[in-house]
């Protein structure tokens, strides 16, 4: 089944010049980039994107991080795109949970600075794509 998912290359991935490597891995997996944009994230967009974490102790630092530099936002499409990208990304904790061969396992060091975001469900993908690409 063809799905769409939102992929973000977070400020640490952009700053470390890993955009080409990450995009290449997405394409080599067989997924298609439907839309791609380099942008600075507003506080409002960040708060909407991470609304499920509002009230948690790490919420403010999450917003500070995602707005700290440019982000690459992409709509990625393909068979089981949500699960396929999450497998490619690796576990949220790059050191303890992400295995070598994944984006986070190969390049990540800290949970907060874990390079990429991918939608975790069809519902999340629809909501996140509408936030980041309202005309898509």
UniProtKB/Swiss-Prot annotation:
It comes from the Bacteria. ATP binds at residues 10, 58, 86, 92, 104, 114. It is an enzyme of class 2 (transferase). Pfam families: NDK. It catalyses: a 2'-deoxyribonucleoside 5'-diphosphate + ATP = a 2'-deoxyribonucleoside 5'-triphosphate + ADP; a ribonucleoside 5'-diphosphate + ATP = a ribonucleoside 5'-triphosphate + ADP. Its main location: cytoplasm. One of its GO terms (biological process) is CTP biosynthetic process. GO terms for molecular function: ATP binding; metal ion binding; nucleoside diphosphate kinase activity. Its EC number is 2.7.4.6. Its cofactor is Mg(2+). The active site is at residue 117. NCBIfam families: PRK00668.1 (NF001908). Homotetramer. Belongs to the NDK family. Major role in the synthesis of nucleoside triphosphates other than ATP. The ATP gamma phosphate is transferred to the NDP beta phosphate via a ping-pong mechanism, using a phosphorylated active-site intermediate. This is Nucleoside diphosphate kinase.
């Amino acid at each position: 089944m063809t799905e769409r998912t939102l992929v973000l290359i977070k400020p640490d991935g952009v700053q470390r010049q890993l955009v080409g490597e990450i995009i290449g891995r997405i394409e080599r997996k067989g997924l298609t980039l439907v839309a791609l944009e380099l942008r600075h994230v507003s506080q409002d967009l960040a708060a909407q994107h991470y609304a499920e974490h509002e009230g948690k102790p790490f919420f403010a630092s999450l917003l500070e991080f995602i707005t700290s530099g440019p982000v690459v936002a992409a709509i990625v499409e393909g068979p089981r795109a949500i699960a396929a990208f999450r497998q490619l990304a690796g576990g949220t904790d790059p050191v303890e949970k992400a295995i070598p061969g994944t984006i986070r396992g190969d390049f990540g060091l800290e949970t907060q600075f874990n390079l990429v975001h991918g939608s975790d469900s069809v519902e999340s993908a629809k909501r996140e794509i509408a936030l980041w690409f309202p005309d898509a």
